[in-house]
């Protein structure tokens, strides 16, 4: 066993003495059992994580029952909704790397035989995923689950995105204070990840098709007894994985990454999944995985399930309609869309996991014969503004908008743009350009949910576009193009766009261009000032020095002269 490194032999007597002091070694025979880490992410200020201490206790009990010795530790967590619109958002994406590094540190320092990961919200799941392939110790994931959708006084289904959009409507005078406060009070009625197909739930759904979580992981409610049952089931599967020495890199292959994007396309997931899954591919040592490959997948996978913010349906509606398994079953039956014979943490293949799945509500999950669209809900755009690519959630764009051509109005920060939208400087026909908000420029690639929500809340969702080298919340909808690469801080051409330039967003042709000759752009480049880091000390300064643009997944890259 891997853990023999810290518990076997005369030399490890001091380590054994310390292990006895933990209270987890309850009998002499426990030293002969697998040591299992429970990588939890309990934190009081994140509603998706407030119940995870209880879930960890369920996992501990089941691990002991299955023959292992559990040891729990916690990572950090950032709530993107609470951190939105201020300096806190600059820490959100960077927290992914902190989580991965922290988990790697504890797992490798203590030589665990297996790891039970309990994530839930936006950066916690991908951070733990990066750690799982980096340490490559037998592992399983079981998230905390989504919250219930809220209900307004008027009987309207609510999610957190409803509140963000209400801010714009209230400021504009089109919503009463009574309705505004009602939304605020009722949109988030329980613990769990936010109720729509936002980043957290998108990632937790992808865990099922990646093969790292059991069916039901992405949609089973946080407050349900079934969520506790999933934790128990996962603990027993983990002990089998340890026994058989099946590791994350045996499961997370190039085919698995392809299939994750296929499901993403079918369910119209958050654009953040692109960032995190690209980072996962890099961490797993999968070479030559780029945005063009994602577009190829989008062209062959239909869009089957439109969930909030793209509709009024919540994650619980998806669960009742058959869950992720029902969507995956459609992709299996489609033929050629995914690789269904890959192994998963259940010991079965994807095909076997979903064999009995069926659609219970064809309004929530469309059958493959009647998709929302014959192509996927996400699209990668390329052009002279984004030579390395950009991402848009086409499932969140009004279907009547196929090509948008408008006049650029440029801002060098999120806050400047929000102010301009609020004071009506931004008008119908504008393309709002927000740059220097990428991974390096932000720093931290903050989400642009406030400006997009304000645009939609004012009724301009079809009439104003927004493009940025920053990113978007999974709650974003409208004509919102993010992840533009290279970013402005890295010299990307988004920095060369001027007010009044005509920008064309062509969704069918997957292009993003500014109508300015190349030679003019090159002249503008000569006048471009050198980027200087906005943060000079602390973690964000170190992050700025190492982070790369979004087309890589926003990974940290060690200077080549240090590793060659």
Curated annotation (Swiss-Prot):
Q: Which reactions does this protein catalyse?
A: (2R)-2,3-dihydroxy-3-methylbutanoate = 3-methyl-2-oxobutanoate + H2O; (2R,3R)-2,3-dihydroxy-3-methylpentanoate = (S)-3-methyl-2-oxopentanoate + H2O
One GO biological process this protein is involved in is: L-valine biosynthetic process
Question: What pathway, per the record?
Answer: Amino-acid biosynthesis; L-isoleucine biosynthesis; L-isoleucine from 2-oxobutanoate: step 3/4; Amino-acid biosynthesis; L-valine biosynthesis; L-valine from pyruvate: step 3/4
**UniProt cofactor(s):** [2Fe-2S] cluster; Mg(2+)
UniProt xrefs under Gene3D superfamilies: IlvD/EDD C-terminal domain-like
Family annotation (Pfam families): ILV_EDD_C, ILVD_EDD_N
Give the cofactor note text. Binds 1 [2Fe-2S] cluster per subunit. This cluster acts as a Lewis acid cofactor.
Q: Which residues carry this modification: N6-carboxylysine?
A: 123
Task: List the active site.
Answer: 473 (proton acceptor)
Q: Record-annotated residues binding Mg(2+)?
A: 80, 122-123, 447
Entry EC number(s): 4.2.1.9
Binding of [2Fe-2S] cluster, residues: 121, 194
Taxonomy, superkingdom: Bacteria
Among InterPro entries, the record links this protein to: Dihydro-acid_dehy_C, DihydroxyA_deHydtase, DiOHA_6PGluconate_deHydtase_CS, ILV_EDD_C, ILV_EDD_N, IlvD/EDD_N
**Assembly and interaction partners:** Homodimer.
Sum up the protein's function in the record's words: Functions in the biosynthesis of branched-chain amino acids. Catalyzes the dehydration of (2R,3R)-2,3-dihydroxy-3-methylpentanoate (2,3-dihydroxy-3-methylvalerate) into 2-oxo-3-methylpentanoate (2-oxo-3-methylvalerate) and of (2R)-2,3-dihydroxy-3-methylbutanoate (2,3-dihydroxyisovalerate) into 2-oxo-3-methylbutanoate (2-oxoisovalerate), the penultimate precursor to L-isoleucine and L-valine, respectively.
Protein name listed in UniProt: Dihydroxy-acid dehydratase
What is the originating organism of this protein?
Listeria monocytogenes serovar 1/2a (strain ATCC BAA-679 / EGD-e)
